[in-house]
């Protein structure tokens, strides 16, 4: 069977859809039409491919992590090096596409939310490239955690708005960015940073991120003469994971593993494991698994990694879980920090804390597999942004 989702109403099974105020319905439909048209427009696709190659630096390598593999003592571990993209993460694959789309719709201003700051930097980058006005909403907590990325965005000409509402993290930044979009919808495009939000956003972001899996599939076939036995990626909203997974969805021999943030542990209140612990609800314009209390109030998500502490998850991930097509696991802060250090020492690669969650699970999984088997892990971003946070954490532990 060939996988086909979403349906014409933007649903992935019971997840997804389009739950937006009337003021946004026109903009969302306009976006949908522009996106469909762009897919069959050779000039648009040519320009997109030009920027991905010449500006972003694609394709990214599929690197055999020989020492990490030896450490795990099982399957071969390949790293899809999204950390080598311009701006240091997978986020720019999507922002380039959406900025071109905004330009096609005649919109000269863009707005975005950001958690770790990576999507904010990638949005500010393309706004500078295409000479667009850019506003970024970021939770006050994240502004503190990621002050370097705030400065980067400002250097690139963006206005960064610190959000003081609620938990002052990603969820609240999305709320404010959506409000801003409602008020400025005529001349502003919302560059959604993950496979979230009302239809067609999850589909658009998935398709722009699919370059990850398309390349990885081809590269692995060239290196090993077969498809990988497993693919692994971290999941917050889930765009790097969906970008890796989607091109493999019909290859049923390939196991797909998403890794959520377990924070201090699933038995505590301090985690961001939405697919393990969430229940169905509506958040930011779509039906999805959401961390909520018995009254349906959205709970605060928690993770050492600012890019994973979102209380929802992309609707297509929940659909994959229901179909049994992908399995979802979780990794604690401590395990992620351990994996961060392990990759530094074995391969000389400093990964983002987000990606470290995937590395942690991948090492565990590889050790249970045979040496003739192989896996691809999405190294979604580099860890420069996290070094300071990690330094403080490790120094704190030695002082205790």
From Swiss-Prot:
Keywords: Amino-acid biosynthesis, Aromatic amino acid biosynthesis, Lyase, Pyridoxal phosphate, Tryptophan biosynthesis. PROSITE patterns: TRP_SYNTHASE_BETA. Pfam families: PALP. The modification N6-(pyridoxal phosphate)lysine is found at residue 91. SUPFAM superfamilies: Tryptophan synthase beta subunit-like PLP-dependent enzymes (SSF53686). GO terms for cellular component: cytoplasm. Its cofactor is pyridoxal 5'-phosphate. It catalyses: (1S,2R)-1-C-(indol-3-yl)glycerol 3-phosphate + L-serine = D-glyceraldehyde 3-phosphate + L-tryptophan + H2O. GO terms for molecular function: tryptophan synthase activity. It comes from the Bacteria. Tetramer of two alpha and two beta chains. This is Tryptophan synthase beta chain. It comes from Listeria monocytogenes serotype 4a (strain HCC23).
């Amino acid at each position: 069977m060939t996988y086909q989702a979403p349906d014409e109403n933007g649903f992935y099974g019971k997840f997804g859809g389009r739950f937006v105020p009337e003021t946004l319905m026109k903009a969302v439909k306009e976006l949908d039409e522009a996106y469909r048209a762009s897919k069959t427009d050779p000039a648009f696709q040519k320009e997109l491919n030009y920027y991905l190659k010449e500006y972003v630096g694609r394709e990214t390598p599929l690197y055999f992590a020989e020492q990490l593999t030896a450490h795990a003592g099982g399957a071969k571990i390949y790293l899809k090096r999204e950390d080598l993209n311009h701006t240091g993460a997978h986020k720019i694959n999507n922002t380039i596409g959406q900025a071109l789309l905004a330009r096609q719709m005649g919109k000269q201003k863009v707005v975005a939310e950001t958690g770790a700051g990576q999507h904010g930097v990638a949005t500010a980058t393309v706004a500078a490239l295409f000479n667009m006005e850019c506003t970024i909403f970021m939770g006050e907590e994240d502004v503190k955690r990621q002050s370097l990325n705030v400065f980067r965005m400002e250097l690139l000409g963006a206005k960064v708005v610190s959000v003081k509402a609620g938990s002052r993290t990603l969820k609240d930044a999305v709320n404010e960015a959506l409000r801003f979009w409602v008020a400025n919808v005529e001349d502003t495009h919302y560059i959604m940073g993950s496979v979230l939000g009302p239809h067609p956003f999850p589909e658009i972001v998935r398709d722009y991120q699919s370059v990850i899996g398309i390349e990885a599939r081809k590269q692995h076939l060239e290196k090993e003469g077969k498809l990988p036995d497993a693919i692994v990626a971290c999941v917050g909203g889930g765009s790097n994971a969906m970008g890796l997974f989607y091109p493999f969805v019909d290859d049923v021999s390939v196991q797909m593993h998403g890794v959520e943030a377990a924070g201090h542990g699933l038995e505590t209140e301090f985690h961001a494991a939405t697919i393990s612990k969430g229940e169905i609800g509506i958040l930011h314009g779509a039906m999805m698994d959401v961390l909520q209390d018995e009254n349906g109030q959205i709970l605060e998500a928690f993770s050492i990694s600012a890019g994973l502490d979102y209380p929802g998850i992309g609707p297509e991930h929940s659909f994959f879980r229901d179909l049994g097509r992908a399995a979802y696991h979780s990794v604690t802060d401590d395990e992620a920090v351990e994996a961060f250090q392990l990759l530094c020492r074995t391969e000389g690669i400093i990964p983002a804390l987000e990606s470290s969650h995937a590395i942690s699970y991948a090492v565990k999984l590889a050790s249970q597999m045979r040496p003739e088997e192989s896996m691809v892990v999405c190294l979604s971003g580099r860890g420069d942004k996290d070094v300071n946070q990690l330094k403080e954490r490790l120094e704190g532990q030695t002082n205790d």
